[in-house]
């Protein structure tokens, strides 16, 4: 592949074409007093077809070019023990300062090749799904133009050969998330969610910018050649002064984009956008960027072991924290949102214990089953006439069988059931934590795996099993399967949820750990111990047993759930009654939003009000108003002497001249 720049350029062209056509068509209809986005006025079929073909086609062609580039590279890398050298293609010089230049250059290596494989594939399937899902929505052209721009930004981020260019893609996905989360701009909650995502990410992006400057200060360059310099220092056992601070700043940026620690709060609210957007953000694009950044800068983090430890603990804490919230959510998309936060915590846990390859492997497998789950939830919502409360669902397995089967496969995959993809990637993370001696982190991850299995099968049980629990409109009774444009992507994603783990089967199970060997040249690992085969198999069986226990527990409580909306499961109701305040706290998402409001937003709002009223209005405005008042008084005094009569001016001139002569004579 000699033109890597074409891969991000194609979605960019799709954005420009779709946006231009949508804008021109909207203006033409506005002249006819109909309006392209007016409720109830559908776009002409030809225009919808154009937007769909351009939107899907541009990303689909990018996927074809991606696989044309990465398949030969991957095959070549597997034949060379040390892997192929990265392919770097310079497009043009972006900035120059003395001898230093920042180029628009694209890099293909094992890490970017792995990212390209699922970003373009999953992105294409989400675009295809959107053709059916968004068919009757307003702003069809605007939607596909934003979606194409999102893909352009993400592909730029993945292929960038320098931190400055990566940051362009980084900010691009942030902008697109704001546009797409707030897609329904006539709804206040969607607008608020878009703002929340944008502002929360600015906190992380501030750290990211400082981290980029820190990298330049340490290594004299922000190109990814600094990774090789860092690798040499790892081998030499030298860590430059300030590397810990730089790692923390880059990690802050990763936390914002990948919703870790307190910066997770924007991600659940991102459900305000269309469901395919949720799938794109949560599965293949934006939220994986933080993990990718940590893996790309792995050599830098290895130089700061304390920073890695912090990454691991933040990831583990976020994983179990978000999993507990997922236990008590009733909105089908909110359950999946907190599941994403939890699974991202798993990925950061892996990176924190030095298993960067395991973290990226889980990014890879997670993209398929999480996209399948989100798109499946969209199919459920479509069938239930936009109902998202699982307490009003039930009995849908027979009415939307394709959606049910694909979501069941994806649920078993995320739960870590053998031989599905999630089993291998999750166990690679847990095994790495154990092998590196982080047994507390291992136990946290193991317990989180059980919670994941429980709340995900709770979702399946409440949605598909039991008797319909719909409202008076009887949506459950009249549910219908989605069109082929929506179900075919579900089946493809479900298939990858089964087979994607094959590239990471460990040697103890007869595999070759192909993904680990493939990524080896692109990431730097600290020393991780080896486990005895018996212990490794024992830990796998233990995690499998925990997952099965979680599934069984969810089935026992929710599998046959029926009855009124207020009491979907008597056992669950009794459990939450027994847990009392703790249960209510979990159901209310640990009151994190309220805590942030009380501890951060409200104090800053009060400080802002004080500065506005006490400083700006009183002091700054006071100075300006006092100046105006003095000028006004001076004007009034001068006006007293300004009569408009020449004789008065002549008298004043004569008296003044006489006074001047007297002063000179007396002196």
Language model regions located:
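Membrane-entry segments of alpha-helical transmembrane domains in multi-pass membrane proteins
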Residues: 1-10, 46-60, 100-118, 156-169, ...
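Membrane-interfacial, low-structure loops and terminal tails that flank and connect transmembrane helices
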Residues: 29-47, 392, 472-478, 629, ...
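Hydrophobic transmembrane alpha-helices and their helix-loop junctions in integral membrane proteins
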Residues: 125-169, 175-485, 494-496, 502
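Hydrophobic alpha-helical transmembrane segments of polytopic
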Residues: 4-14, 51-65, 112-119, 147-150, ...
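Aromatic-capped, Gly/Pro-kinked transmembrane alpha-helices
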Residues: 88-91, 97-110, 506-542, 556-667
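Transmembrane helix-loop-helix hairpins at membrane boundaries of multipass inner-membrane proteins
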Residues: 1-5, 9, 21-145, 219-239, ...
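Hydrophobic alpha-helical membrane-embedded segments
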Residues: 63-67, 370, 450-459, 545-571
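Hydrophobic alpha-helical membrane-insertion segments
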Residues: 57-77, 204-214, 410-414, 489-509, ...
